[in-house]
UniProtKB/Swiss-Prot annotation:
Active-site residue list: E277
Protein name: Microtubule-associated tyrosine carboxypeptidase 1
Catalysed reaction equations from the record: C-terminal L-alpha-aminoacyl-L-glutamyl-L-glutamyl-L-tyrosyl-[tubulin] + H2O = C-terminal L-alpha-aminoacyl-L-glutamyl-L-glutamyl-[tubulin] + L-tyrosine; C-terminal L-alpha-aminoacyl-L-glutamyl-L-glutamyl-L-phenylalanyl-[tubulin] + H2O = C-terminal L-alpha-aminoacyl-L-glutamyl-L-glutamyl-[tubulin] + L-phenylalanine
Function comment: Tyrosine carboxypeptidase that removes the C-terminal tyrosine residue of alpha-tubulin, thereby regulating microtubule dynamics and function. Also able to remove the C-terminal phenylalanine residue of alpha-tubulin TUBA8. Recognizes adjacent tubulin dimers along the same protofilament.
Region (Disordered): 1-40, 77-111
Organism: Mus musculus (Mouse)
Pfam families (UniProt xref): MATCAP (PF08014)
Amino acid sequence: MVLDSGTQVYEQAPPRPPAGSPSQHHKLKPSNGNGPPLYPWPESLGMPLALAVPSALQQQTMWQTFSKLHLEQSSHMRRSESTYSVNSTGRRGRGKAPIGRGCDPGGTLRPAASLPHIAKIRKDVGSSSSKSPCMLVALRPTNMDQEREKFFQSHYTYNPQFEYQEPMPMSVLEKYQEASAQFMNQAVGIIEAVLEKFGTYENFEAATGGQLLTKCQIWSTVRKYMQKEGCVGEIVVQLSEDLLSQAVMMVENSRPTLAINLTGARQYWLEGMLRHEIGTHYLRGVNNSRQPWHSTEGRLQYGLQPANPTEEGLASLHSVLFRKQPFLWRAALLYYTIHQAAHMSFRQLFQDLAQYVQDEGVRWEYCVRAKRGQTDTSQPGCFSKDQVYLDGILRILRHRHTIDFQLLTSLGKVSYEDVEQLRPYGVLDNTRVPHFMKDLERYRQQLEHIMTTNRLDEAELGRLLPD
């Protein structure tokens, strides 16, 4: 599901922050320093966006990540990647301070006023035309299906030997090779709270997720949600059975595109996923493109912290918002799985997760996510990026009483810690706030409900995350 904070693909150095007047709009131009030029952006969409790339969706068309991050000179990352490390505590490094499923498979795109287009994802994955591979493509094993079969035929005693299409981006692997234990107590507590109430994960999924939706049901739900956000016709919708995540935003043929995993589109979970991908990532991306810090240079000039963990934390909270039982199960189990993977082989990790998840297919997926980037999974090791979800959730909940959530969204892809310093410089005309955030009293009540349901202790969060 989604997955960068910082910079936009269209880059130009912003003006210096004015002494006492609001920032003005700035035209964006293609960046010449990050791979091939982009397709022209449709004028009807206004400001350009760059969204994320799913691991199974790389095609010969050019993909752009949702606000790129320079891992090396021109590598791409998932939309909400950032230079933030989940192992760090306290303030992060800054730049310089401011100077002053098939109703209509395939076919042509629909006009802006029509229903969202749904197309089956093509599997003819070609080699990337970029100088550097997308992180999710580079870290997705090319022999995953074969290794899965070997693993299950061995009765879970074989450690998969993964192969990858592209050379491993070592800077990424090194960045995410260390797992954090900072919030392990909270992760285990959330998992145990779910199991106490439902007995098993499978019961939890059946009770809170509801039935899997058909393609037409997905289409209808997406259309209704887009109407709520006023973005019908802005986003193409595609369906896939090959995503490691539940959903992902990207750009295909210069159109904002939402790919949805058919195997995870459940009756009561789909709208939460839409709040995550569209209501959070997409709208914050739209708002970010209007700000003077939309580029790498702009973020440095304004001294901004990475947008993560705020970006994914906020989106993850929105995934469970308004549920009767808003358990943070997925974020907690990802956090736990990655911590354990750092000390276990693949088969050991698979057996360890049996205490929480009986379904072997679900366990396999969690283990693959945690072991991404490894070739010999008999060795301990992890890919720790997915710990950002719970990390971001807990940081936002810790400061939920003081965060200006509407301004946080309007300012684009920024950390909650930078909101106050950016308040005088933000371009707030025509920014977009998701429909579920307009009633702030109700929104804050839901955050309290999430705290209570997941048994999160205010004092403990204060100790772990002091001011």
